[in-house]
């Protein structure tokens, strides 16, 4: 990957565009501290804004080589080389001993004659290094600092809270490292670093294509920030292994394949509205440049060394027009188009616009004139400014046919989207003089790419700006702050649910797994990743968690929750959840029968023994004698009737299965929810035969299904343990 110099206003890049240079790069020194601080001051960075990848090229040192104590300067041929005196070097061990006041291990004896004591090294014996046994103090275990402390058992409630507090939407990536956020086509991370440094590692790539991006970024980056100078097509997005969100900083998203990103589950973010005023100001500036030919006058004056006479000024002014009374046509009267029209009215321009999506009365409120056909719009405009969205209907809307309908000598201004103009047709119209001038801030072709034949290269009367209409120092900083905050939301929260500026949020949620897009309130342990145990988070997220396997923290009661943990759709359907719970309790009942009790296998050494005592409401209550977490499942008040109705139909004599009658036991909004989600959840539901279930539970023919107790504790909770439900 090419290396870029981090010195301000130095644009040198190694192997840039295939060119080679004999410059080399130096890292920012870490020690001594005074030298590091002087380096950071020279390049305008601080400890918070500096990144580890930053390098300084050798052109900022006298003679092209860095010497000891040198500070980089902008230009050594003009600026005097700065050099400081460094403090004496200290080894790591001596520095550590000095800070901790630890004496040297082998102090060197001073010679009586003052000579070097090197002669005494050969005469030293074993006793010189170790004190005599008589002077060695007796060993007292009570005072020994190495006495092992008694083991402290972890608080079971704290252990359970550690599991439940782990984020359910930690983005995919290596569990042993922090998330990686990459700035693809830039190198200044001074604004983003303070916002993201505590949750992610920020790296800059300064790449013009994905071929220049380091493999580590492609494999580990979960979020990306980008400007306009790099394009992400489908094949580019597929190179990123774990990318979840891309934020486009600036105006427009033409350089991102949003459709491909949606198919890959990548959220595309863009913050509109922060640059409306800036784009409108730049657009009006380009319009005035075309009318008054200011750009060509300035260019002629800067390129000519002799005095410019009246004849040359008159020659440069060919094609200029009076601003007042001219007609400005705005194609797309949205926020930017409206802002441009209001500014242009102050200069005496008559404003017309064509936008079939604007409500009636919008023109009267603004003082504009509305036209209802594209032909009338093109034929009446002296200058056309494009401010519409890019889509299938608007792509190439300025082409050879539409340009033929324009007045001769019309001006074209585009600060919106590059695909709105057919550049080949515009180049032909500029060369034959039908279009007197054009100002383009966005380009469909790469202007300086030698492998791309740009039709606009060499065209007369054209102003090209590098997608800078939105750029001001204040607006750029605001956009970067919003982008960093959005990336922080994606890392700490739910992606894309919590994103404010995601333009494909609904599509990503609709195309993704239905379980993943509804993790907000269904189940606290849903959608957590664990390398060996499904639906559990990595243990590195909770360093003080004492168990290598989270199941051990919950004891044997965790076995009763397995139906919920193994099937992510169960928390969304009370009927399916209760069916699986009944099946699990049936297995426990069969193991607890007198016939099988004598042949039960010995319990696992990790299983917590518990004493059983009857509960208050007909269910069995367990009181653990060893530290173990008590697992309780909350039952919402409005779901009680649904579960009881399902149990009644499950044990009914007609033998209907629970799956076929689940919808009839749910009322109101819950029934509609099941119907809308039926295609998603019915695949995961297990159809239970009622007769077979009654045989396994040893339940005879019941006239009143209410005799089966489901262990409702005060109408709010169900305590789940190893014992079968009371019948």
From Swiss-Prot:
Gene inactivation effect: Adult life span extension and increased resistance to oxidative and heat stress but not to DNA damage, starvation or pathogen stress.
Q: Report the protein's function.
A: Binds DNA and represses gene expression. Plays a role in regulation of life span, possibly by regulating transcription of genes important for lipid metabolism.
What does the record note on quaternary structure? Homodimer.
Write out the biased-composition intervals (Low complexity): 587-613
Protein name listed in UniProt: C-terminal-binding protein 1
What the entry lists under InterPro entries is as follows: CtBP, CTBP_dehydrogenase, D-isomer_2_OHA_DH_cat_dom, D-isomer_DH_CS1, D-isomer_DH_NAD-bd, NAD(P)-bd_dom_sf, THAP_Znf
Instruction: Quote the record's binding site residues for NAD(+).
Output: 251, 331-336, 355, 388-394, 415-417, 441, 467-470
Q: Which family does it belong to?
A: Belongs to the D-isomer specific 2-hydroxyacid dehydrogenase family.
- Where is there biased composition of kind Basic and acidic residues? 77-94
Gene3D superfamilies the record matches: NAD(P)-binding Rossmann-like Domain (3.40.50.720)
Can you provide one Gene Ontology molecular function annotated for this UniProt record?
Answer: transcription coregulator binding
Entry-linked SUPFAM superfamilies: Formate/glycerate dehydrogenase catalytic domain-like (SSF52283), Glucocorticoid receptor-like (DNA-binding domain) (SSF57716), NAD(P)-binding Rossmann-fold domains (SSF51735)
Organism, per UniProt?
Answer: Caenorhabditis elegans
């Amino acid at each position: 990957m090419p290396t870029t110099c981090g010195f301000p206003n130095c644009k040198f890049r190694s192997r840039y565009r295939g060119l080679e240079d004999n410059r080399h790069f130096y890292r920012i020194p870490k020690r001594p501290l005074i030298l590091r601080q002087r380096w950071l001051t020279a390049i305008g960075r601080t400890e918070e804004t500096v990144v580890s990848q930053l390098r300084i090229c050798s052109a900022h040192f006298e003679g092209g080589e860095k010497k000891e104590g040198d500070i980089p300067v902008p230009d050594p041929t003009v600026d005097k080389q700065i050099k400081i005196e460094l403090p004496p070097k200290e080894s790591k061990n001596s520095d550590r001993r000095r800070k901790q006041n630890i004496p040297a291990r082998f102090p060197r004896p001073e010679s009586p004659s003052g000579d070097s004591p090197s002669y005494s090294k050969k005469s030293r014996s074993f006793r010189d290094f170790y004190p005599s046994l008589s002077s060695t103090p007796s060993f007292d275990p009570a005072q020994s600092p190495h006495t092992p402390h008694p083991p402290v058992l972890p608080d079971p409630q704290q252990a359970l809270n550690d599991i439940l507090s782990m984020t359910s939407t930690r983005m995919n990536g290596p569990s042993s490292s922090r998330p990686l956020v990459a700035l693809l086509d830039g190198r200044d991370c001074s604004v983003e670093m303070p916002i993201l440094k505590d949750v992610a590692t920020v790296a800059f790539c300064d790449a013009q294509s994905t071929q220049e991006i380091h493999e580590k970024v492609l494999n580990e980056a979960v979020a990306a920030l980008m400007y306009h100078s790099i394009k992400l097509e489908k094949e580019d997005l597929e190179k990123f292994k774990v990318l979840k969100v891309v934020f486009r900083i600036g105006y427009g998203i033409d350089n991102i394949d949003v459709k491909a990103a949606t198919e890959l589950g990548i959220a595309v973010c863009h913050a509109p509205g922060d640059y409306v005023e800036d784009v409108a100001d730049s657009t009006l500036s380009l319009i005035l440049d075309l009318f008054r030919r200011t750009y060509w006058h300035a260019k002629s004056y800067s390129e000519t060394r002799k005095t410019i006479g009246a004849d040359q000024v008159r020659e440069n002014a060919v094609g200029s027009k009076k601003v007042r009374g001219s007609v400005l046509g705005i194609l797309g009267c949205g926020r930017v188009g409206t802002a441009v029209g209001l500014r242009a009215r102050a200069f005496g321009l008559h404003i017309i616009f064509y936008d079939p999506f604007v409500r009636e009365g919008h023109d009267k409120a603004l003082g504009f004139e509305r036209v209802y056909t594209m032909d009338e719009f093109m034929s009446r405009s002296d200058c056309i400014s494009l401010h519409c969205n890019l889509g299938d209907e608007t792509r190439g809307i300025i082409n050879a046919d539409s340009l033929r309908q324009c007045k001769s000598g019309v001006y074209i201004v585009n600060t919106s989207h590059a695909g709105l103009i057919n550049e080949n047709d515009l180049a032909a119209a500029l060369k034959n003089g039908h279009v007197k001038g054009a100002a383009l801030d966005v380009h469909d072709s790469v202007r300086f790419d030698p492998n791309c034949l740009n039709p606009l290269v060499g065209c007369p009367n054209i102003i090209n700006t590098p997608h800078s209409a939105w750029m001001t120092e204040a607006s750029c900083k605001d956009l970067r702050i919003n982008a960093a905050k959005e990336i922080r939301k994606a890392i700490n929260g739910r992606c894309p649910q919590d994103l404010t500026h995601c333009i494909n949020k609904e599509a990503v949620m609709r195309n993704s797994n239905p379980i993943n897009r509804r993790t907000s309130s269904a189940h606290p342990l849903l959608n957590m990743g664990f390398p060996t145990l499904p639906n559990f988070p990595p243990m590195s997220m909770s360093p003080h968690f004492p168990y290598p396997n989270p199941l051990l923290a919950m004891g044997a009661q965790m076995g009763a929750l397995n139906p919920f943990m193994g099937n992510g759709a169960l928390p969304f359907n009370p009927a399916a959840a209760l069916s699986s719970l009944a099946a699990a309790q049936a297995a426990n009942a069969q193991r607890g029968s007198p016939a099988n009790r004598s042949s039960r296998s010995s319990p696992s050494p990790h299983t917590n023994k518990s004493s059983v005592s009857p509960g208050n409401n007909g269910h069995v209550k367990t009181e653990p004698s060893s530290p173990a977490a008590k697992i309780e499942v909350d039952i919402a008040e409005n779901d009680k009737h649904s579960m009881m109705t399902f149990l009644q139909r499950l044990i009914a004599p007609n033998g209907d299965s629970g799956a076929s009658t689940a919808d009839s036991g749910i009322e109101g909004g819950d029934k509609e929810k099941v119907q809308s989600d039926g295609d998603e959840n019915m695949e995961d539901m297990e159809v239970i035969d009622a007769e077979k279930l009654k045989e396994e539970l040893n339940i005879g023919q019941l006239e009143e299904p209410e005799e089966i107790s489901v262990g409702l504790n005060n109408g709010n909770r169900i305590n789940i343990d190893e014992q079968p439900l009371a019948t």
